[in-house]
């Protein structure tokens, strides 16, 4: 598990009411790394935040952490199943 993925998972679990439903996957696509964050449908609004500010902050943190590892990170927040 990469450091970026761990950071995203820890932050998401801290922000949600259902931390056990948080799931994070990481995949490589050419020169980019895609991190998908799956959360409970009831928590999706908390992670997006007002006007998308929380989601934007999470994406910025993931991108910055990825730069330290030499990775181009894209973070997508999705409703889990």
Question: What spans do the regions from the language model cover?
Answer:
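RNA-contacting regions in translation and RNA-metabolism proteins
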Residues: 1-46, 56-81
């Amino acid at each position: 598990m990469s450091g970026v993925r761990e950071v995203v998972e820890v932050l998401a679990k801290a922000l949600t009411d259902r931390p056990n439903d948080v799931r994070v996957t990481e995949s490589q696509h050419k020169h980019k790394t895609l991190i998908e964050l799956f959360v409970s449908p009831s928590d999706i609004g908390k992670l997006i935040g007002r006007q998308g500010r929380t989601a934007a902050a999470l994406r910025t943190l993931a991108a910055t952490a990825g730069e330290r590892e030499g990775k181009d990170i894209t973070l997508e927040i999705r409703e889990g199943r």
